[in-house]
Amino acid sequence: MKTVDFQRLPLEAGDTVLDLGCGEGRHVISAYVEGDIHAVGVDLSLDDLKITRDRFEGFAEPDNQAKSFGLSTASALALPFADNTFDKVICSEVLEHIPDYHGALREIERVLKPGGLFCASVPRRWPEKICWALSDAYYNVPGGHLRIFRSDELRGEIEYLGFTHYARHWAHALHVPFWWLKCLFWRTQDSNWLVKQYHRLLVWDMMKSPALTRILEKSMNPIMGKSVVMYFRKEAAS
């Protein structure tokens, strides 16, 4: 399930791409598959990186010297890369988990090349507020969401660091009711019939990608997409 749209974040041959907070690898692997690029995934969780490594094995192209894939465990506040290393940076559904997200944004600005592109996604405010209202446990779990962003304020904070915003969209509207159900039945979510049936629907949709649900979600995303996805260009050095 991709949140980032690679038409809005176009990858060019030879690009070095960072997926910050890559989790189990959905975007860093997708970027590698997308073109002849050098993909790097960073996460604090060694367990998630192991899952990413295992998933990547089915996509590896060891004979293609034009592309590479690497993983590293590191803090978003102290990235182990030199200034101006990356052509593209992805940070999807991560900033809401980081206590000092301003520090993470400064690190992103530091490692991104002048003129490079940055994609950030966070949970959309109003669906997220309903999740918080339905269950305290939703945001109190270890590693859970620490804040609810206002997308316009986050955009302004990123622009303040020297970025220009150039695109925005919303994603995953079909997932919103699923998370509301999980929050409503938090204590019994693993056995709740409604939660299980909706999960089956989402798995079917992801595996089969039928036209009906694709059209439905596309029409719903501007209204209730779970994620807001914003794209920025780092200002070139003067």
Regions found by a protein language model. Give the residues of each.
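A SAM-dependent methyltransferase catalytic signature shared across enzymes that methylate proteins
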Residues: 152-169
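Conserved catalytic loop of SAM-dependent methyltransferase domains
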Residues: 167-203, 226-227
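Residues lining the SAM
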Residues: 92-95, 121
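A short glycine-rich, Lys/Arg-flanked "PGG" loop and its adjoining helix->strand segment in the class I
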Residues: 102-117
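Alpha/beta-hydrolase-fold catalytic nucleophile elbow
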Residues: 121-122, 171
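Short, glycine-/aromatic-enriched active-site segment of Class I SAM-dependent methyltransferases
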Residues: 123-147, 155-157
